[in-house]
Amino acid sequence: MHRYRSHHCAALRKCDVGTKVRLSGWVHRVRDHGGILFVDLRDHFGITQIVADPASPAFKVIEKVRSEWVIRVDGEVCARSDEVINATLPTGEIEIFVQEVEILSKSEELPLPVFGEPDYPEDIRLKYRFLDLRRETMHKNIMRRTEIIAAMRRAMQNNGFTEFSTPLLTASSPEGARDFLVPSRVHQGKFYALPQAPQQYKQLLMMSGFDRYFQIAPCFRDEDPRADRLPGEFYQLDVEMSFVEQEDVLATMEPIMRSIFEEFANGKTVTQNFPRISYDEAIQKYGSDKPDLRNPIIMEDVSQHFYNSGFKVFAQILADDENAQVWAIPAKTGGSRAFCDRMNVWAQGEGQPGLGYIFWRKEEEKFEGAGPIAKNIGEQRTEALRIQLGLENGDACFFVAGDPKKFASFAGAARTRVGEELDLVDRECFSLAWIVDFPFFEWNEDEKKIDFAHNPFSMPQGGENALECQDPLTLKAFQYDLVCNGYEIASGGIRNHLPEMMLKVFELVGLSKKVVKDRFGALYRAFHYGAPPHGGMAAGIDRIIMLLQGVKNLREVALFPMNQQALDLLMNAPSDVSSTQLRDLGIRMAPTQKNSS
C-alpha cells in the first residue's frame, strides 16, 4: 500500500464497503458522541468520516488530534446506517472504522477557523492565506479559476490562435498608469519596467509575420487602490490578429467569450447575440460606458417638457446653457413619496442638491402627477412626460438637469440605485454587450490640453483625412469594450499601423517625433518595414472569474493577492533590502522627511 494513501477523501462509495484503505488529510473537525469519536478528514478532493470507538487500537491517538492536524489513517470501509447517511457528501453513505493512525503534522492554535467559514477580517485572511485557501468556498473559487483559464486556452487554440509568452522585463512606456520599475545592476542608473500590458509586444508579433496570438498575460500597474482592480498585478486574456477590421475581431471573440460564460454560468442565462451600443448611446441611455443591461431602466432626454415651464430651476438651466438637457430616470413601481424621499436623501449623500421627481396615481381613470415638479409644470406637461416614458399608476420618475458631460455619471449611478432599490435587476443572467465608437481624444481640464481618451495605439475612424480636417474632440476611434453586468471585462481596438499617422496622432496631444521614437521606438521602427493591418483585445481574467463566481471582491478569486494598500501581508512585501543589495545596484536611499528633520 502507498505510504500515505490508497484513495483520496472523496473517492470511496458504498460499493467499497469491506475494503481496507489508507487515507491522509487534514482534520476538519472532531466530534464526540457518547464516547465514540467522529473525525471529518479533508483533503483537496473532499471529506470522509472516520470513526473510532474505545475498542479501536487507534482510539487514544484519535483522542489527541485537533483541527487542521495532518494525519494518516488505516481502516475498513463501513456502511452508514440509513438514519445517519449524509446526502450532501459524495462519501456520505460510508465511514472508515479506523485501525491505525499516524500524526504527520500538528497545527498551532488557528488564527482563523477553516471549518464553518465565518466572516473574518480581510487582513487576517490575507496574512494566513494558506489557511484561508483551505476553506471550502475559497478552495472552490481557486479551482474554478484554473478551470476557466483552461477553458479560455482551449477556446483560443480551437479558433486558430497560438499562445506566445512575451517578456516581463521591458522598457518603461506611458500606458495610463505608473510603471513598476526594476533597477539594472549591469547598467547602473537605468531601469527595466514590468509591463502594464503586452501591448507593443503583441503588435510586434503581428509585424513578425504571426497571425493570431493569445496569452494569459500578467500585467503590472502601480495604481492607487481601486475597488474593481487588484493592486499591483492582474491577469488578462491578451489577443491580437492580423489583417482584420473591427467587425472581424468582434465576430471572432464573441462566440469565444459566450462559450466561456455558458460553460460556467451555473444555470444563469447568457446573452446570445451581443448588442453593439455606441459610446454616446451608452452614456445617454445608461449614464455609463459599462452599463448593467440587467437593469431595464433606460434614461431619456425630456428637455422639451421643461423649456419655459413653471419649474424655474430647470427652465433657467436650459435657458442659460445651450448644451444643457434634462434627463429622466423612469422608476417602475417606485411611485411612493417614501421611496422618492429616500432617493432624494441618497442624492444629497452623493454631493448633489437633491433629485427631482414625479410619481403618478390613477384617480377615476385619470392619471395625476404628485410632487413639486408636477405641481410647477402643470397637468398637461406632466401627462406628456408620462406618455413619453410609458409610465403607469404607481410608477415614478427622477430628473437631473445641466450639462450631460457633468451629470451623466451621477445619472448613471442614480439609475443603478433605482434599479437595485426596486429590485428591477435580473440576477439570473449575464448580460453582455459591445460598446463601440469611443471618442479618440478628450479635454484634460487640469493641463488645459487634448489627451487620449483611451488607447493611443488605435486607428482613428476616417483615417488620416479625419485627423487633418476634424476637430480632434469629435474624432471617434476603432475602439471597443465588452461589458457584462456593469463591468468592463474586455477592451480592444484596431491598431494604427501607419508611421506618419502615428506621429500625427501623438502630435495632437503634444508629443514630438523624438518623444514618440524614444518611448515607442521598436513599434515605430517596425511600422517602416511592412506592418499589416491588425487589431485585438484584452479580457480581464480576474474580473470575469469574479462575475462567474458571484463574488463582489476580486481578492476572493486570486491566489495570493495584496490588500487594498498594495501590501502583501503573507510575504511581507514590499520590504526593506540590504545596503549591499542597494550598493550593487548603484542606488542610495534619499533621507525621509522624518530622518532629515
Curated annotation (Swiss-Prot):
Q: Which residues bind L-aspartate?
A: E175, R221, H454, R495
Annotated positions for site Important for tRNA non-discrimination: H33
Q: What family is this protein classified in?
A: Belongs to the class-II aminoacyl-tRNA synthetase family. Type 1 subfamily.
Q: How does it assemble?
A: Homodimer.
Residues annotated as region Aspartate?
Answer: 199-202
Q: Which InterPro entries match?
A: Aa-tRNA-synt_II (IPR004364), aa-tRNA-synth_II (IPR006195), aa-tRNA-synth_II/BPL/LPL (IPR045864), Asp-tRNA-ligase_1 (IPR004524), Asp-tRNA-ligase_1_N (IPR047089), Asp/Asn-tRNA-synth_IIb (IPR002312), AspRS_core (IPR047090), GAD-like_sf (IPR004115)
Which residues take part in binding ATP? R221, D222, E223, E488, G540, I541, D542, R543
**Which example biological process does GO assign this protein?**
aspartyl-tRNA aminoacylation
Q: What is its main location?
A: cytoplasm
Protein name from the UniProt record? Aspartate--tRNA(Asp/Asn) ligase
> Which key words tag this protein in UniProt?
Aminoacyl-tRNA synthetase, ATP-binding, Cytoplasm, Ligase, Nucleotide-binding, Protein biosynthesis
Where does the record place it? Cytoplasm
Instruction: Report the EC number(s), separated by commas if there are several.
Output: 6.1.1.23
State its role: Aspartyl-tRNA synthetase with relaxed tRNA specificity since it is able to aspartylate not only its cognate tRNA(Asp) but also tRNA(Asn). Reaction proceeds in two steps: L-aspartate is first activated by ATP to form Asp-AMP and then transferred to the acceptor end of tRNA(Asp/Asn).
